[in-house]
Amino acid sequence: MENFVFNTTPSIVLQTGGLAKIADIAGRLLGKRVVIVTDKGLRKLGLLDPAINALEQADIAVSIFDDVQADPPESNVLALKDHILAHEATGVLAIGGGSSMDVAKVAALIAKSGETLNDIYGVNIARGPRLPLVLVPTTAGTGSEVTPISIITTGASEKKGVVSPLLLPDMAILDADLTVGLPAAVTAATGIDAMVHAIEAYASASANNNPLSRSLARNALQLLGSNIRTAVFDGQNRDARAAMLLGSLLAGQAFANSPVAAVHALAYPIGGHFHVPHGLSNALVLAHVLRFNLPKASHIYAEIAADVFPELGAVSTEKRAEAFVEKLASLSRELGVPQTLREVN
């Protein structure tokens, strides 16, 4: 048995309607002054209201930072840090997609530790400590609630990462109620994104690839593959929404410990230069990268093919990997995901 180290978020709660019980679930952890991090769109939709009401009823003071932008720039992180300090926050609660969670993770760290962003870019450079942190995803895709990674846009288009176990939150809450209103297009792109995380984690050439990550990746693919169509075409189905959230989380745990590869390497510059959402950037290049990798990775893709498409279990091993790649491309088209950069302007 190979040796490995595995790190993840220590407390995970899957509860439909859980946000309305946030004071009971995480009130003691967050303390008496909480900053909620989100974007203006989610605030306008009222998705924060259950959390605000629950916290205030528990005599916990709430301040809201709703200026998070897509592909968050450094200024976003610094503005949140200043907001946290101005309100003397005892805890940070992020409710949103990957951008909100990434911003919250870094700001909760530097607001407490006094480090600057330039101090902590890179791998395992941050010293900490950080404020108590709870993350609540509103999309099933990024897995940021269980990853020690935040990606920040520097300058016009360059992206830099902060990678540190200090970015793992104290708790992640998966609440399907928060995802039932997601448009089909967002559900599809973020769902494919989660699949990318699982596929790349399973196939990773990293020395950190390990049996636990591979097991999580396969479980993620089974959940995502069997629920993504329902989540896209019947968005009010809470069972499918919860399954997608869990699949995304498992994929996040997998790639947090067994790093992603070429799909993400190509997706980041697409997002940085053309402002294409990260999940969609991954979806655009997925099939192309898998086809390129087939000569060296066909045995790996054959192992996971039936996790997503059970009918491929009856296909010969020699043909299964190629069929897997083509069926992924077909699934992406079926879900309405754009296939070319031209389609996303």
Q: What kind of feature is each model-predicted range?
A:
Residues I149-S258:
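Carboxylate- and glycine-rich phosphate/diphosphate-binding segment that chelates Mg2+/Mn2+
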Residues S113-T138, L166:
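Short, acidic/small-residue loops that bind anionic groups at enzyme active sites
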Residues L19-V35, A54-A58, A86:
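Glycine-rich phosphate/diphosphate-binding loops that line cofactor/substrate pockets in enzymes
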Residues M1-L29:
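N-terminal amphipathic/basic leader segments beginning at the initiator methionine
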Residues G141, L249-N282:
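Glycine-rich phosphate/pyrophosphate-binding beta-alpha loops
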Residues H273-N345:
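Gly/Pro-rich interdomain helix-loop hinge
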Residues R43-E115, I125, R229-R241:
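N-terminal small/polar loop signature for handling phosphorylated ligands or for N-terminal nucleophile
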